[in-house]
Amino acid sequence: PLGMQLDQNNVVTSATFANAQYFLEARPYHENVKFWSVNPGAELLFGAEQDIKLNVQANATRSWLARESPSILVTSPFTTVDYRNEGGDRPSITSPLDLNDPNLGWGWTGGRVNIQNEKRQTETRGARADLQFGEDKRNVKIGASYDMAERTIRGFDNSTAWEQVVCRGNGGNVCNGGAGSAIPNAALASYLKPGPGGFITADFSRFLADTNYYALRDAAPESNSANTGASTGGIREKNLGFYIETNAEADVWNRTMRFNAGVRYVTTDQTITGPVTINGVRSVQVLDSDYKETLPSFNVAWDVADKVVMRLSSSRTLTRPDPSAMLPNTNFSDPSAQTATQGNPNLKPYLSTNVDFGGEWYTGGEGYVGLTLFNKRITGFTVNGIRRIPFNDLGVNYDTLLPIQQAGLAQRGGPNAATVDVQTQVNADGVLNIRGTEAIWVQPLDKLFDGLGFSLNYTHVNQQSEGEGVPAVAVGVAPNLWNGTVYWEKDAASIRLSYTWNDDMVISGANQNGIPYARLNADARGQLDMSASYALDWLPSKPQITLNITNITNEPLRTTFAWPNATYDLYEPGRTVMLGIRGTF
């Protein structure tokens, strides 16, 4: 770098970079998805007054996904780049090169190709039954449910074999486009073409056909991860739940109060599998875990005036832990056999204790004004920790260990007695408190224009953490957000214009790129959308013609790295227009 200038946060604001290179990383995606679902059910009424109701339901789904995403990376000639970061949503990066010219002199030095495919299979099965005694306003309900979900992810990688054909000359160790390469440097330009965004792209059909891609893709061996970041492995989860619930209605000070309370008991059994490579030997490891929770809840609504309702509710909810942190991913390379790294199948779920208090004032028709105060107290966050476990619980075959590792275990009493310190994700003791306010106003304007109306919604969130191992904030939660909708609905026609706004928000944990304080942040953003429909009432089943326009003003999505002027990425999703017809038969 020449003449580099920094601001007070050490963010580069200007510089000249000599001996710089651009690179193209082109990656076409091809996905094939299959899915089926069946969901039978029935409702049965019993009793002399038909006030005993039995609802039964079953469900089953299965889906398959196959994704291929070959990568081609080529580099430009060395050049001098002028960098300016002096305002705006992105820095200015200029050079004398025409980056949309396939004949610029693009080459393989520093380049690569990848064959990285992914297959996923998901299967679910479930059944539930609910038995209600009494009418809908006053009753007791009991029920049970069973759910099974199984997901398998498999990554495949044949990059080295493809590189041997494309640019290593069938025998080299470096991708340099030398003699014997299917696409040598001299021919590379003919496999490139101008791109739609002012930067070259690849002629994928020719490139893949001339480099034996399809045969190598089909022969790709399984790898421990996919290029999407997902780890190879599977998880099977079985949930069994029981609940009892009561609904009641009574007069309190001559005002109607509606009450709902219940408790749910849930048990979860998980079986987690994944590949483990120890000293060059690859095997599949199976880990089991289970947990159970009791989840109470209640809701009270009281008509304190003719058009005013006050509400109070509380509940305890459960969110499953991250499956990727529970996969084995065992590494046991310590010569002394004292330490290892591994996923933790025994991670406990996130638990949230929730309290909401608020009310609504009904102004007539569909109109009302509402205000709610809410609090969520969340536990179950994870941090890196150490678990000391018996060697036999590590899931590693003793016969695959090196002699020096077997000797280390023997010095500590042998494989049946020795313990191992495992670095893994563990549940932290801290708590994250999320408190907030939500206000809503829905108002028909029929007196001004028949069918016209609007709705406004505003939410403010404040977050505080207590104890160790808890993030300062929950990622992806904006401190302020609001949306407004203007609508017109009349007979067969309707149209809605909506605007949504989110404040700046944190979207990642700390320690990004090894910088302790660095987080990724999303810029504040507003988006305008429209939806409209018209029902063809004179046709059978009254089909609707629909029009949906998303992101009318073409707003971009921008994220920054720690500081507002350090652009991390800028994504322009564009404007989406969908015209369709919807009906039943």
Residue locations for each model-derived region?
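Outer-envelope beta-barrel architecture signal
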Residues: A48-V56, D136-V140, R255-F259, D306-V308, ...
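Outer-membrane beta-barrel transmembrane strands
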Residues: P1, Q21-S69, L104-N158, A215-R258, ...
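Gram-negative outer-membrane beta-barrel transporters
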Residues: N375-R377, T382-R387, L394-N511, R582
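Flexible glycine-rich, low-complexity coil/linker segments exposed to the extracellular/periplasmic environment
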Residues: G3-A20, D82-G111, V165-S231, R388-N427
